[in-house]
């Protein structure tokens, strides 16, 4: 590609509304242009990267034996009503009616459509296992789109769905997909972790996320210092403390605390160690229980894990915090004065709270706290559960090492759906025994557009993007110095351009009448990994200058060795 025939569209300045590095650089490098909130035009440079990501994803899906199909973005609402997700999904699901007043949605995912397809096309266990995939546009009406294509409303996704007669068959495909995803992200050149994850609105049982490590990530991922254990913080187990509860050293006593409405204020005003405090959170109780609210207690320096709490049998799902009015009507005190002593509703305490002694908590009387509380002596131990987020330094759940926490960008997610959708939508096949059985399902997603942003978050410097070779928009840039004044430079550049193209190398030839500084800046900004600089002075010695974008290494290459050297660098 010649720059004179290309829409390069680079920018010197960063647009004011760009927040994270990938958003800034994708705009400056001319990869995307904003059309509306969460909607982007993909420009030529961006599309080149996107297509290379797609190619790798498609190749590895084909290697698993998955079969490519394409399903509509527009989906009938009755399929979503049939699966039960019409009400569950919420406002992210864009709903509309056609001219015949028939309701439809813009698909944020395709479980319903694929299940409908399979129940009409597959009738026998002999046709299973079967895995189908597509690379298709999705739409989620995000309440606050941000970070460019990292959290946009419209995005490109690879979604695969597998269908099985047995759980054993599903597990085999799930394991194969796990390996395929690992190969995809390794080939692309990402530093990633596969972590245990919650199934969320998709549903199902087992689930793994593939997280790219990046400071701008929205997820906290947890992994051990001494083993392969890794999990999303939502799912990471906070193991019970190894030590027993200490012997009480003080009596429980009531303290006036009119200006201490938060744990931070209590700690500051009364010189309490924060690990000697307990915070009490009120949530709605599950239907069928004898109480309207449930109290959840965690240590003052810990945070409630809402995903864990929501899975407790006494807690309503989705988790809903009580209003101040609800709390006052039942407890008789405001949110800043709640605690376990004389509490008129059931309580569930975290494992770390169960081993506390001589601790402070609200007295369930406005502007008062009890200090010196001890379990069993002052009140019975309530139900104990793991309901907090882990923190760095916690013991790893597998007993090996301690936990580290890093930020991550989710680029892939695999699920064992089981029969959630096939049962709801009556997708059955005739089994070996001649009777109909519900099909068992798995689903496997990759955020193709998000991969592009995640790769930039991991690969950039103050001059621009540093693409891994596998997904660079161009593998090699040819920069001829003063080509329009030197016939020799032009002749060498043209020949090298032709030779590289003939070798199947993706090359951009900067044939503009521009200053060298502009040419270098643009190629560094868009992240071309390998640059060849051609100038009269070096040609006197039969050489050109080679520069590697990632390490800034420069070296002189003989003209007759340039193509072979670049092919070696690129692994061609």
UniProtKB/Swiss-Prot annotation:
GO molecular function: aminoacyl-tRNA deacylase activity; ATP binding; proline-tRNA ligase activity
Top EC category: ligase
Main subcellular location of this protein, as a coarse class: cytoplasm
Top-level taxon of the source organism: Bacteria
One annotated Gene Ontology cellular component of this protein: cytosol
EC number, UniProt record: 6.1.1.15
GO terms of biological process kind: prolyl-tRNA aminoacylation
Keywords annotated in UniProt: Aminoacyl-tRNA synthetase, ATP-binding, Cytoplasm, Ligase, Nucleotide-binding, Protein biosynthesis
Pfam families: HGTP_anticodon (PF03129), tRNA-synt_2b (PF00587), tRNA_edit (PF04073)
InterPro entries named in the record: aa-tRNA-synt_IIb, aa-tRNA-synth_II, aa-tRNA-synth_II/BPL/LPL, Anticodon-bd, Anticodon-bd_dom_sf, Pro-tRNA-ligase_IIa, Pro-tRNA-synth_IIa_bac-type, Pro-tRNA-Synthase_IIa_type1
Compartment(s) of residence: Cytoplasm
Comment block on domains: Consists of three domains: the N-terminal catalytic domain, the editing domain and the C-terminal anticodon-binding domain.
Assembly and binders: Homodimer.
Function, in words: Catalyzes the attachment of proline to tRNA(Pro) in a two-step reaction: proline is first activated by ATP to form Pro-AMP and then transferred to the acceptor end of tRNA(Pro). As ProRS can inadvertently accommodate and process non-cognate amino acids such as alanine and cysteine, to avoid such errors it has two additional distinct editing activities against alanine. One activity is designated as 'pretransfer' editing and involves the tRNA(Pro)-independent hydrolysis of activated Ala-AMP.
Family statement drawn from the similarity comment of this UniProt entry: Belongs to the class-II aminoacyl-tRNA synthetase family. ProS type 1 subfamily.
Protein name, UniProt field: Proline--tRNA ligase
């Amino acid at each position: 590609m010649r720059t004179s025939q290309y829409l390069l569209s680079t920018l010197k300045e960063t647009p004011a509304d760009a927040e994270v590095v990938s958003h800034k650089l994708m705009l400056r490098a001319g990869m995307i242009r904003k059309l509306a909130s969460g909607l982007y035009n993909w420009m030529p440079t961006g599309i080149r990267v996107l297509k290379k990501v797609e190619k790798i994803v498609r190749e590895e899906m084909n290697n698993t034996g998955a079969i490519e199909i394409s399903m509509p973005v527009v989906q009938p609402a009755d399929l979503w009503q049939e699966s039960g997700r019409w009400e569950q999904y919420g406002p992210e699901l864009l709903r509309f009616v056609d001219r015949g007043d028939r309701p439809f949605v813009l698909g944020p995912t395709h479980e319903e459509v694929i299940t409908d397809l399979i129940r009409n096309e597959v009738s026998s266990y002999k046709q299973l296992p079967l895995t189908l995939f597509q690379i298709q546009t999705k739409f989620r009406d995000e309440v606050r789109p941000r970070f460019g294509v990292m959290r946009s409303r419209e995005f490109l996704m690879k979604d695969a769905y597998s269908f099985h007669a047995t759980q054993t068959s599903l597990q085999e495909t799930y394991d194969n997909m796990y390996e395929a995803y690992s190969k995809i992200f390794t080939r692309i050149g990402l530093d990633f972790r596969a972590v245990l994850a919650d199934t969320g609105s998709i549903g199902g049982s087992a689930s793994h996320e593939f997280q790219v490590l990046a400071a701008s990530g929205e997820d906290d991922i947890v992994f051990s210092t001494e083993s392969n254990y890794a999990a999303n913080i939502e799912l990471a187990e906070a193991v019970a403390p190894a030590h027993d509860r200490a012997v009480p050293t003080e009596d429980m006593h009531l303290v006036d605390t009119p200006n201490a409405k938060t744990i931070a204020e209590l700690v500051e005003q009364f010189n309490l160690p924060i690990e000697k405090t307990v915070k009490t959170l009120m949530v709605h109780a599950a239907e069928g229980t004898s109480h309207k609210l449930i109290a959840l207690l965690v240590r003052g320096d810990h945070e409630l894990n809402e995903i864990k709490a929501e899975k407790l049998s006494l807690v309503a799902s989705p988790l809903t915090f009580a209003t101040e009015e609800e709390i006052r009507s039942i407890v008789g005190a405001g949110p800043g004065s709640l605690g376990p002593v004389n509490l008129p509703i059931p309580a569930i305490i975290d494992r770390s709270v169960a081993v506390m002694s001589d601790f402070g908590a609200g007295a369930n009387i406005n502007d008062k706290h009890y200090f010196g509380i001890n379990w069993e002596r002052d009140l019975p131990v309530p139900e104990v559960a793991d309901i907090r987020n882990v923190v760095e330094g916690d013991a790893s759940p597998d007993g090996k090492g301690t936990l580290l926490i890093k930020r991550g960008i989710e680029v892939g997610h695999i699920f064992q759906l089981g029969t959630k959708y096939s049962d709801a939508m009556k997708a059955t096949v005739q089994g070996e025994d001649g009777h109909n059985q519900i099909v068992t399902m798995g689903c496997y997603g990759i955020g193709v557009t998000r991969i592009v942003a995640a790769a930039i978050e991991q690969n950039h410097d103050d001059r621009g993007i540093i693409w891994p070779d596998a997904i660079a928009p161009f593998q090699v840039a040819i920069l001829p110095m003063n080509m329009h004044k030197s016939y020799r430079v032009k002749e060498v550049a043209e020949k090298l351009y032709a030779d590289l193209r003939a070798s199947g190398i993706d090359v951009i030839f900067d044939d503009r009448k521009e200053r060298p500084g502009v040419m270098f800046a643009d190629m560094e900004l868009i992240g071309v990994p390998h640059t060849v600089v051609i100038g009269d002075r070096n040609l006197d010695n039969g050489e050109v200058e080679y520069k590697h974008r990632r390490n800034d290494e420069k070296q002189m290459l003989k003209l007759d060795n340039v193509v072979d050297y670049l092919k070696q660098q690129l692994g061609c």
